[in-house]
């Protein structure tokens, strides 16, 4: 006779198996319409984006056109709301690019089931007030959104369309930073918000995808402690709610503004990449996230051979925010960089760990959205000249500032990169040794933070922070003469910051350090925008870094 405990375990096992089978059956259903809700404030609306700009970003070509197979219902805006007349085909609304456009294309490429998007968003709204489900104030977004969603779903019912609500993509929190009470209680308010949606939509298993507030914006600098507080609140929810996921966005593009170039909105490129992030987060939950394995054909070095390891590090342009492989195809004499080079082992962690290599891969394009960094042209140039083996390890976070790389970090502790960076370098060295190579760390090639050059307090402290990073890295890596090659593009030219001669300050640090090489990247191809380099600029930067190293041999 079975004991009760044995019977209980057997019952639990059957329950789990039934649950797995049930979930698999749900995902295998390719006929039920999957409805996604997009909600939030201005960076969910798509503020400061333009449909005409889509053509500037080749991976997203065509997203200005209607997606006829995707249903769309929307209510967007504050005082003057733009509403769809029932369900329509998904397309930009009033020349604005929202994340739903790239989300839909990415999802429909991965699944056969039809999808629909309901979007309710308004700039300048806060969770503590407008979106408060219990006591909404201001624009009373929660009851408005609930009514709009119910109305859209009722229309599907009237058409006898079989559907299910698949998830909610939520991007909001910037305005809660400006209210001390809302900021302090953001996590608590968000938890309540999710619970009320599940209750009011009668979907207890409703998934939420919570978008990070992008630290690449000006608010990620001048409001650093406040933005950090919101992120802590978001993570407090996503870390305990198994149906809520935290979606990083700090590596996406950000609009280039006037004056010093900084902005608080994602703009066209950022919105397109923003949507892909939500799509990948969703596809991850159903086991359909796209992958592109890039294994080495064979280990490129013989046992005992000497290998020079080059570490590339930095922010927006070292990551390659606006350098696209499609642009590389059009550059004369550069198309060979598109091919994987199996003679150079390449390891990377980009976007603050948003994407990492599967061990060592061949040198080749491996960015987030068909992007690449200076590593391609750098690796090609160095590899042609050196007799020893060449390996490249790249560690970047385009949403970081120099302070995040310093040993002491900042009050926004979750943004501190220094420990992860040093660990990444150590692991790269050790892995090569474990494979039987004699390894030399040939140098760290760091491209100075672009955003830092556009905000006075960070521009003013750039040289001291750089020196702290360099000095401590040599101590922690046990290499007192470790070469640092620090490249600097022309610093932001604007009256707000021109009183700080950051170039002279970096020169002073370099002149006192025989192993710090200051590379003035002042002759790169002319750029259309401040701060960011395009495809030609990133290629030229890699070649300049290689030239600087090779000239010192």
Residue ranges and their predicted role:
Residues 1-11:
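Bacterial N-terminal signal peptides that target proteins for export
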Residues 10-20:
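Bacterial N-terminal signal peptides
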Residues 26-553:
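Cell-envelope and extracellular/periplasmic
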């Amino acid at each position: 006779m079975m004991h009760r405990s044995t019977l209980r375990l057997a019952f639990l096992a059957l329950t789990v198996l039934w649950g797995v089978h049930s979930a698999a059956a749900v995902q295998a259903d390719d006929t039920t319409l999957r409805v996604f809700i997009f909600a939030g404030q201005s960076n969910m609306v798509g503020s400061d984006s333009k449909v005409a700009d889509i053509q500037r970003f080749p991976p997203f070509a065509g997203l200005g056109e209607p997606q006829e197979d995707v249903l769309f219902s929307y209510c967007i805006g504050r005082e003057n709301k733009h509403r769809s007349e029932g369900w329509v085909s998904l397309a930009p609304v009033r020349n604005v690019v929202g994340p739903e456009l790239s989300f839909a294309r990415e999802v429909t490429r991965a699944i056969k089931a039809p999808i629909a998007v309901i979007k309710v968003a308004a700039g300048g709204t806060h969770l503590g007030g407008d979106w408060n489900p219990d006591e909404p104030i201001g624009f009373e977004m929660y009851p408005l959104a609930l009514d709009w969603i119910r109305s859209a779903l009722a229309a599907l019912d009237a058409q006898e369309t079989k559907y299910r609500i698949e998830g909610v993509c939520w991007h909001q929190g910037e305005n809660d930073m400006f209210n001390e009470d809302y900021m302090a209680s953001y996590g608590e308010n968000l938890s309540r918000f999710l619970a009320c949606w599940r209750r009011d939509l009668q979907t207890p298993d409703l998934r939420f995808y919570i978008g990070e507030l992008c630290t690449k914006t000006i608010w990620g600098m001048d409001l650093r402690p406040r933005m950090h507080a919101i992120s802590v609140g978001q993570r407090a929810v996503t870390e305990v709610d198994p149906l809520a996921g935290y979606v990083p966005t700090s590596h996406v593009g950000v609009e280039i503004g006037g004056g010093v170039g900084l902005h608080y909105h994602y703009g066209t490129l950022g919105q397109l990449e923003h949507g892909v992030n939500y799509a990948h987060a969703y596809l991850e939950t159903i086991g359909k996230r796209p992958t592109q394995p890039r294994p080495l054909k064979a280990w490129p070095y013989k046992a005992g051979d000497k290998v020079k390891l080059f570490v590339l590090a930095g922010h927006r342009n070292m990551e390659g925010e606006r350098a696209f492989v499609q642009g590389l195809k059009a550059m004369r004499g550069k198309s060979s960089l598109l091919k994987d080079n199996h003679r150079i082992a390449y390891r990377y962690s980009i976007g603050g760990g948003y994407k990492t290599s599967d061990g060592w891969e061949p040198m080749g394009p491996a960015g987030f959205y068909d992007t690449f960094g200076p590593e391609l042209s750098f690796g090609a140039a160095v590899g042609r000249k050196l007799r020893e083996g060449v390996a490249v390890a790249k560690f970047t976070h385009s949403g970081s500032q120099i302070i995040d790389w310093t040993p002491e970090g900042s009050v926004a502790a979750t943004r501190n990169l220094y420990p992860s960076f040093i660990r990444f370098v150590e692991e790269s060295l050790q892995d090569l040794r474990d494979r039987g190579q004699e390894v030399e760390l040939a140098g760290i090639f760091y491209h100075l933070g672009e955003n830092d050059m556009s905000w006075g307090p960070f521009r003013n402290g750039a040289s001291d922070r750089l020196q702290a990073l360099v000095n401590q890295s040599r101590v922690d890596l046990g290499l007192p003469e470790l070469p640092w090659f620090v490249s600097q593009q022309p610093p932001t030219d604007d009256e707000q910051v021109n009183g700080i001669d950051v170039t002279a300050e970096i020169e002073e640090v370099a002149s006192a350090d025989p192993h710090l090489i200051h590379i003035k990247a002042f002759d790169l191809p002319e750029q259309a925008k401040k701060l960011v380099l395009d495809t030609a600029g990133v290629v030229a930067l890699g070649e300049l870094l290689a030239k600087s190293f090779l000239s010192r041999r």
